[in-house]
């Protein structure tokens, strides 16, 4: 028996070593740690030093990387590599990331030589691409059809290709500003098949005329800071949805525009033509226009006929032109019935323009040659809330005591930098700000300030006032007055008690 028992041990040992039957599905204890397994979840793949806050997001911003990182998960949809030192994009690495929707390469050292033609070929779901602030000399020949936003600004791009931005039905925004693009580097079919582009920025390039065949879907077009001297006839005939057009800082002359240049822009609200070489207001302005910038041109006269179509204009900016005594003849602005603000800073006007629109709210006329204010000069604009006549040639003897009588809504009056020797009479009682610095005021009397109980700020710096030149009762009604800016301040002494007036006088700081 003993021998037979010993003989069974090898068989029992063999049975113990044999694997058991496979487990029945649904009967395993999920909480039981099986051999070789860990209680911790498997770590997600994330490149060294980068952060991966989500399974689809890899952030390698500002790590001074010189080589494209490996170990990027194929599940990545958002990859940020901005602010590094990358010089090239390896095709084999990018081709793995076919699910990318956002690729940010802003502020690297990527050159066109380091960007293969097929670099983005496999990124069929890419929607947002930023390669701004790199060293590209030509744009990529091919960008994915799925693209919605493309930013190639601040490179050295001299040429783009038909399929860089063409045939992109979902493309909405293209940023190409601060490059070296000339018209020769912009093919006529550059945007063919991309009928959804709403924003196109081509500012700070070397364009000499407005590019043809722009997308008809445009809403915002930036062309400032180029060399544009001409808008070809019909170049803007299809852009009926355009709302904002920026053409400032170019070389536009009157001959570079015609009566049809802007006439088809039935949605245009904002037009900036400042810093050009225009001598007249352009013709054919659309009725929808609300803001027109014409500052820093060479305009000598404004003709009513040129503004007849722009009846909806609210802001007209004509600062730093060559408007003289006949620059704004009576009725020139009459078509602009809804005009809110008129800027005429830095011209040669010797009087307030006559027959201004009745609804005008802000008249800005500093640094002109206005030497007088007559009794009727401002009667046509009773709704004015801001009047700026600073740095003109106004003398007290030539400011009529009824010049401001109709300006009951006026809140801000700037008469700084003139030749006034006393406060004007008849100031509107609703004034809150009165600027009188840099005149020749020799005294302050209570009568001109009577009733100005809403005045909050009164500036008298750089006049010829002394403390003793301020008459008793001058400050009586200025209970809310505050002087915000002062160089040398004196506390105004309280006036001696008057038998007719209460002695409650504010302690006011005034600068002179």
Curated annotation (Swiss-Prot):
This is Podocan-like protein 1. Keywords: Extracellular matrix, Glycoprotein, Leucine-rich repeat, Repeat, Secreted, Signal. The gene is PODNL1. Glycans are attached at residue 71. Gene3D superfamilies: Ribonuclease Inhibitor. N-glycosylated. GO terms for molecular function: extracellular matrix structural constituent. Disulfide bonds: none annotated. Residues 37-74 form the LRRNT domain. Its main location: secreted. Pfam families: LRR_8. InterPro entries: Leu-rich_rpt (IPR001611), Leu-rich_rpt_typical-subtyp (IPR003591), LRR_dom_sf (IPR032675), SLRP (IPR050333). LRR repeats lie at residues 75-96, 99-119, 125-146, 147-167, 170-193, 196-216, 217-238, 241-261, 267-288, 289-309, 312-332, 338-359, 360-380, 383-396, 409-430, 431-451, 454-474. It is found in: Secreted, Extracellular space, Extracellular matrix. Residues 1-26 form the signal peptide. Belongs to the small leucine-rich proteoglycan (SLRP) family. SLRP class V subfamily. GO terms for cellular component: collagen-containing extracellular matrix; extracellular matrix; extracellular space.
């Amino acid at each position: 028996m003993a021998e037979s028992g010993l003989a069974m041990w090898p068989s029992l040992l063999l049975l113990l070593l044999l694997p058991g039957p496979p487990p029945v599905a649904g009967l395993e204890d999920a909480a039981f740690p099986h051999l070789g397994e860990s209680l911790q979840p498997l770590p997600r793949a994330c490149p060294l030093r980068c952060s991966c806050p989500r399974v689809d997001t890899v952030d390698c911003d500002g790590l001074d990387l010189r080589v494209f990182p490996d170990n990027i998960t194929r599940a990545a949809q958002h990859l940020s590599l901005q602010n590094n030192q990358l010089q090239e994009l390896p095709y084999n690495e990018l081709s793995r990331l076919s699910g990318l929707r956002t690729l940010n390469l802003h502020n690297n050292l990527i050159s066109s030589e380091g960007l293969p033609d097929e670099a983005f070929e496999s990124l069929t779901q890419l929607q947002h691409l930023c390669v701004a602030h790199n060293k590209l000399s030509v744009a990529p020949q091919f960008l994915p059809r799925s693209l919605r936003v493309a930013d190639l600004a601040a490179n050295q791009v001299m040429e783009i290709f038909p399929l860089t931005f063409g045939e992109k039905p979902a493309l909405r925004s293209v940023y190409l500003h601060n490059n070296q693009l000339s018209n020769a580097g912009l093919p006529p079919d550059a945007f063919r098949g991309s009928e959804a582009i709403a924003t196109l920025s081509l500012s700070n390039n070397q364009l000499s005329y407005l590019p043809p065949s722009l997308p008809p879907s445009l809403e915002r077009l930036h062309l400032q800071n180029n060399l544009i001297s001409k808008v070809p006839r019909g170049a803007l005939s299809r852009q009926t949805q355009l709302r904002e057009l920026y053409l400032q800082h170019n070389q536009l002359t009157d001959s570079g525009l015609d009566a049809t240049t802007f006439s088809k822009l039935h949605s245009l609200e904002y037009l900036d033509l400042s810093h050009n070489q225009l001598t007249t207001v352009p013709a054919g302005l659309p009725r929808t226009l609300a803001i027109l910038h014409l500052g820093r041109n060479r305009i000598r006269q404004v003709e009513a006929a040129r503004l007849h179509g722009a009846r909806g204009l609210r802001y007209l900016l004509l600062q730093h032109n060559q408007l003289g005594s006949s620059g704004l003849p009576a009725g020139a602005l009459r078509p602009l019935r809804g005009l809110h603000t008129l800027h005429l800073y830095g011209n040669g006007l010797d009087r307030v323009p006559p027959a201004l629109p009745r609804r005008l709210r802000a008249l800005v006329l500093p640094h002109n040659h206005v030497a007088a204010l007559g009794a009727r000069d401002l009667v046509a604009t009773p709704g004015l809330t801001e009047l700026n006549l600073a740095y003109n040639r106004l003398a007290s003897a030539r400011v009529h005591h009824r010049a401001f009588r109709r300006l009951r809504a006026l809140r801000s009056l700037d008469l700084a930098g003139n030749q006034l020797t006393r406060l004007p009479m008849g100031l509107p009682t609703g004034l809150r700000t009165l600027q009188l610095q840099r005149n020749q005021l020799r005294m302050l009397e209570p009568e001109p300030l009577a009733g100005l109980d809403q005045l909050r700020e009164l500036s008298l710096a750089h006049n010829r006032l002394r403390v003793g030149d301020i008459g008793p009762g001058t400050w009586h009604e200025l209970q809310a007055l505050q002087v915000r800016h002062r160089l040398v301040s004196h506390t105004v002494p309280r006036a001696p008690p008057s038998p007719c007036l209460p002695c409650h006088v504010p302690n006011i700081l005034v600068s002179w």
